[in-house]
Amino acid sequence: MSRGAAMIEVTNLCKSFVSGTRRVDVLSHVDMKIDAGERVAVVGASGAGKTSLMHILGGLDRPTSGDVLYDKQDIFSLKGAGLDDFRNRTLGFVFQFHQLLPEFTALENVMLPALIARWSRAKAKSAARELLTEVGLESRLSHKPGELSGGEQQRVAIARALVGSPRVLFADEPTGNLDSNTSESIYRLLSRLHETRGLTLFIVTHDARLAAGLDRVVHMADGRITG
């Protein structure tokens, strides 16, 4: 699909669960569209539903009701391993806490999704090396997470998220655990990757500076989009 055309369409999305005898609404009748290549920030207080929305759009959780369409296809209609295959081919994820495996090197951490996808070891290693160079860590390939700074760990996590060449990158508070200077460098990196790779970015953040630099800011409160 060409850049600028509607890629993700969310209609009347609801998510709730039962706690004791009470129903808790996490998301209430959310509607939104995201264009291919768009950079969207989602902001709001803790508990507003930001991360729940990201998890459902990313196919990590299912809605109680409503539709999530990618290029007009309802991803939750995919059967068997179809949703997993779609997610692995199309989506990448970065989280506040990088979730790198501490016993693996930076190179091995980035290789891992490719190996799980049954790439040859040589192909996975080549792709991981290229991505780590792209994020500025060409001299840190053999370092383990404990030997890297917080910003370097997050760069490894970003490289790992991109190893399958996703179209959409979801990031949940990617700078939330970093100081202001390191946060700025991660923002610049995401912006550069957006341009060079044509990524669609969906970023959950409390960082007002990061949000202001994106194409659109979506405000959430009490499970609803408020602006």
UniProtKB/Swiss-Prot annotation:
SUPFAM superfamilies the record matches: P-loop containing nucleoside triphosphate hydrolases (SSF52540)
> Where is this chain's protein located in or outside the cell?
Cell inner membrane
Cellular compartments per GO CC: plasma membrane
Q: Where on the tree of life does the source sit, at the highest rank?
A: Bacteria
Any Pfam family the entry gives: ABC_tran
Q: Is Cell inner membrane given among the entry's keywords? A: yes
Q: Which BP terms in the Gene Ontology apply to this protein?
A: lipoprotein localization to outer membrane; protein localization to outer membrane
**PROSITE patterns, from UniProt?**
ABC_TRANSPORTER_1 (PS00211), ABC_TRANSPORTER_2 (PS50893), LOLD (PS51244)
Q: How does it sit in the membrane?
A: Peripheral membrane protein
- Supply the EC number(s): 7.6.2.-
* Residue numbers binding ATP: 44-51
User: What UniProt keywords apply to this chain's record, in alphabetical order?
Assistant: ATP-binding, Cell inner membrane, Cell membrane, Membrane, Nucleotide-binding, Translocase, Transport
Give every ABC transporter domain span.
8-226
Keyword Glycosyltransferase part of the UniProt annotation:
no
Q: Which InterPro entries match?
A: AAA+_ATPase, ABC_transporter-like_ATP-bd, ABC_transporter-like_CS, ABC_transpr_LolD-like, MacB-like_ATP-bd, P-loop_NTPase
Q: Which GO terms describe its molecular function?
A: ATP binding; ATP hydrolysis activity; transmembrane transporter activity
Q: What does this protein do?
A: Part of the ABC transporter complex LolCDE involved in the translocation of mature outer membrane-directed lipoproteins, from the inner membrane to the periplasmic chaperone, LolA. Responsible for the formation of the LolA-lipoprotein complex in an ATP-dependent manner.
Q: How does it assemble?
A: The complex is composed of two ATP-binding proteins (LolD) and two transmembrane proteins (LolC and LolE).
User: Which family does the UniProt entry place this protein in?
Assistant: Belongs to the ABC transporter superfamily. Lipoprotein translocase (TC 3.A.1.125) family.
Please identify the protein, giving its name as recorded.
Lipoprotein-releasing system ATP-binding protein LolD
Provide the species name. Answer: Syntrophotalea carbinolica (strain DSM 2380 / NBRC 103641 / GraBd1)
Task: Report the gene name.
Answer: lolD
